[in-house]
Every structure is written in C-alpha cells, then in structure tokens.
Regions:
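TPR alpha-solenoid repeat register
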Residues: 27-28, 60-61, 94, 111, ...
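"A position-specific structural signal for the A-helix of alpha-solenoid helical repeats
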Residues: 30, 63, 107-110, 114, ...
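Flexible helix-coil transition and linker loops at the boundaries of alpha-helical arrays
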Residues: 16-17, 21, 87-105
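TPR-repeat structural position
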Residues: 8, 41, 74, 125-128
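Structural motif corresponding to the intra-repeat A-B loop/turn of tetratricopeptide repeats
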Residues: 5, 38, 71, 122-125, ...
Length: 172
C-alpha cells in the first residue's frame, strides 16, 4: 500500500531494508522498488539480484542493467542487456515517465537504447558514434521514443563539441 502511494520510506520502515532469505518475492520487490525510487541503486540492486536469481526475466534484466550503468558496473550491465535482448519478445513493452505524459515503447527498442548508453559509458570519447548507431536502431523500431531522441541529440551535440575542440587544437 505504501509503495503504491509513493511512500517509499514508510514501506521500508515497515519491512526493513535487510536481505532475508525468508522474504517473500513481494517483500523483496517492495524493497527493490522503494530503494530504486529513493535513488539508492546499489542497495536496490541487491534486492533485484535476489528476485533475478529466483526468476530471471527481461523486465528485471532491464532494470538491473539501468542501475548497473548508474553504479558503473558496466560488465554486469552488459550481461543483463545481452540476456534481455536474447529473450525479449516482440509484444513486450516498457513504460517511460520522463515526460509529463508517461508513454510506452517496445522493450527491444528500450534495450537497444540502453545498450547505446552502455556503449557510451564504456568510453565517452571514442564510442559516441557507436552509441548513436545503437540509439538509432532503437528509433528505427520506435521513432517516437522520446528518451532515445533526447539522448541522441545530447550525443550529437557532444560529438560536435569534440570536433570543435579537435579543430581548435589543430590550429594551435
């Protein structure tokens, strides 16, 4: 109940944040979601890992990969993305909330977008083109995928700034 009302601290105060082998899937999921929403990705990941070990699926793999990128566990993120891309079905969707109006996109597009973000995170200067290519693959599946469009624009802007710096350095 607390979780559905956005009362994440109250939810955690009720059930705690400790990892307990006897916790039900629902308790583990409440802990994972509450910690994620409280911007505690490392702690949330511990609980997501428990859920994933009990029953791995594409949706958990996506969430875990996203948080692993945030916490700089790029190898772990790649493993989760690879698993999810191998097991994703065409009818799977992912909801995004970064705009005023939440929207859905294909889970495959979401995974390709996340793979692009991972590629960029692995080497922020050398991998811009490869990251843009992967995000473009996501946009081929769903041209209205707002987060992918915004991220591509940011990468293209960064690429242009890099080119300007390199041109200025050559002049000197």
């Amino acid at each position: 109940l607390y979780l559905s009302e956005g009362k994440y601290m109250q939810a955690l105060n009720t059930i705690g944040v400790e990892k307990n082998a006897t916790d039900t899937d629902m308790n583990v999921e409440v802990k994972a979601l509450a910690l994620k929403n409280l911007n505690q990705p490392k702690m949330a990941l511990e609980h997501y890992e428990i859920l994933y070990s009990r029953s791995s699926n594409v949706y958990l793999a996506y969430e875990m990969a996203d948080m692993k990128i945030q916490t700089n566990d790029l190898v772990g993120a790649k493993l989760n993305i690879d698993y999810a891309l191998t097991n994703v079905k065409d009818d799977m969707k992912r909801t995004f909330y970064e705009t005023q109006q939440p929207y859905e996109t294909s889970m495959k597009a979401a995974l390709l977008y996340l793979k692009g973000i991972l590629t960029f995170s692995e080497n922020k200067s050398d991998n811009i083109d490869a990251a843009i290519k992967q995000i473009n693959e996501a946009l081929t599946i769903d041209p209205n995928f707002n987060l992918a469009k915004v991220s591509r624009q940011a990468l293209e802007s960064q690429k242009a700034q890099q080119a300007q710096k390199e041109a200025a350095a050559k002049k000197n």
